[in-house]
């Protein structure tokens, strides 16, 4: 709540400082390679991964929401239905990753078409792009890599989908995981080539690493900088690192994902575009499903059906719901030079659902909520501030826990007494590890 903002901020800063020291001595990354994975919006419903059995304990019956990382097998994409249906008050909140990935790919393609006469910097007839991959085992990263390759025609089929494997260096076009494509604009034919792509993982094992992306663009440009016409990134953290390190000065179009505040502001300085995950809707849904479960009202209250305060979202425009997997997905929006001024404050609550709930019908309740990596730009600088605004509006006393981005135990060790909380919101380090949390609730 607002009176606790200072305390919350201090707590987060302390956790962030701790996480930095832990990253330096961490033992390994938090992901595994994925040969084929479904996206976070529509993973393959399957009972192949059902490690989160409910014991019937008091804590196991409390409201639970998984958010941002959908319980699933990181190698196959199969959803962990045991975790998603842990009890009758369990839900998942994320965003439609396939829709957003396709939107990013189309945004890049549209830009190339509109600027084909000037985008080929060295005039060799090849429009070359580089791609920063966040995490080869993360469904969202996989979807975004596929979305770009599908839109640009550089994707190669593998196991019924577009191969998302990093091409590494491919300046000669010989890589097997991608292919050269052709694009005709105004009677002229161009070749499109993925010059290089790489998973941005640091030496401590943390993925989606902005510093690694900044260093990598330096390596790429030193070797083949004159061939790079477009820079694409799985997220804005890495995209902005490459933009600031090289492409801003060289006026090379750069595209990211997340609509982080710094990235949106950078559009005025040449950052070409990003995708809004509708984080304001995601954060609202994360707490709203808990609030509804705690109040014992219909889960659609304040979501698809207006509540007494007038809060309501538009299904099909703001979000979609998949009943089988009990999953809510926010819908994405493209942010470009044409509309970026509408997205300059990424931490502002979404106006249609920014009305205060009545404390007499929605009394104060205590919620335990973790952010898997206190150093993650999107989650810590955008998502958590939104949550902190919404928790006031929903009369929820939320304890925010920041992880190190590497180990589940760094988070679960701080859930020592679940009985003191009324509900739980969980953001895992690895999508495979739902049982690390439910085993505690089962006690």
Question: Model segments located where?
Answer:
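Bacterial Sec-dependent N-terminal signal peptides
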Residues: 1-13
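A residue-level marker of the well-folded mature domains of exported/periplasmic proteins
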Residues: 2-5, 25-443
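Short acidic (Asp/Glu) patches
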Residues: 16
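Bacterial Sec-type N-terminal signal peptides, specifically the leucine/valine-rich hydrophobic h-region
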Residues: 19-22
């Amino acid at each position: 709540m607002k009176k606790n903002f200072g305390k919350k901020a201090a707590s987060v800063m302390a956790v962030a400082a701790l996480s930095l020291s832990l990253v330096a001595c961490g033992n390994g990354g938090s992901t595994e390679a994925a040969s084929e994975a479904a996206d976070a919006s529509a993973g393959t419903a399957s009972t192949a991964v059902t490690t989160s059995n409910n014991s019937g304990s008091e804590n196991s019956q409390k409201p639970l929401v998984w958010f941002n990382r959908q319980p699933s097998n990181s190698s196959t994409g199969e959803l962990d239905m045991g975790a998603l249906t842990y009890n009758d008050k369990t839900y998942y909140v994320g965003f439609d990753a396939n829709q957003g990935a396709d939107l990013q790919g189309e945004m890049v393609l549209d830009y190339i078409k509109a600027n084909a006469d000037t985008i080929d910097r060295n005039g060799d007839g090849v429009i070359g792009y580089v791609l920063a991959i966040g995490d080869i085992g993360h469904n969202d990263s996989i979807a975004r890599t596929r979305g770009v390759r599908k839109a640009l025609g550089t994707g190669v089929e593998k196991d019924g989908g577009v191969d998302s494997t990093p091409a590494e260096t491919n300046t000669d076009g010989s890589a097997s995981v991608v292919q050269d494509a052709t694009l005709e604009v105004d009677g002229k034919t161009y070749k499109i080539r993925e010059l290089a792509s790489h998973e941005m993982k640091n030496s401590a094992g943390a993925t989606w690493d902005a510093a690694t992306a900044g260093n990598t663009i330096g390596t790429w440009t030193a070797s083949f900088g004159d061939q790079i016409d477009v820079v694409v990134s799985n997220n804005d953290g890495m995209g902005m690192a490459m933009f600031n390190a090289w492409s801003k000065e060289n006026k090379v179009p750069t595209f990211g994902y997340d609509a982080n505040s710094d990235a949106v502001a950078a559009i005025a300085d040449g950052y070409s575009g990003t995708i809004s995950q509708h984080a304001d809707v995601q954060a609202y849904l994360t707490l709203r499903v808990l609030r509804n479960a705690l109040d014992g009202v219909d889960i659609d209250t304040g979501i698809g059906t207006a509540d007494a305060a007038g809060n309501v979202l538009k299904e099909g425009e703001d979000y979609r719901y998949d009943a089988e997997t009990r999953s809510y997905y926010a819908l994405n929006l493209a942010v470009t030079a044409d509309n970026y001024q509408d997205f300059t404050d990424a931490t502002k609550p979404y106006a249609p659902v920014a009305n205060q709930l009545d404390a007499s019908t929605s009394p104060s309740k205590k919620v335990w909520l973790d952010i898997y990596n206190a150093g993650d730009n999107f989650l810590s600088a955008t998502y958590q501030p939104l949550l902190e605004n919404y928790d006031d509006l929903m009369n929820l006393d939320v304890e925010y826990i920041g992880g190190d981005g590497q180990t589940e135990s760094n988070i679960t060790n701080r859930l020592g007494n679940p009985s003191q909380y009324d509900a739980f919101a969980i953001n895992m380090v690895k999508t495979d590890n739902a049982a690390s949390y439910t085993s505690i609730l089962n006690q």
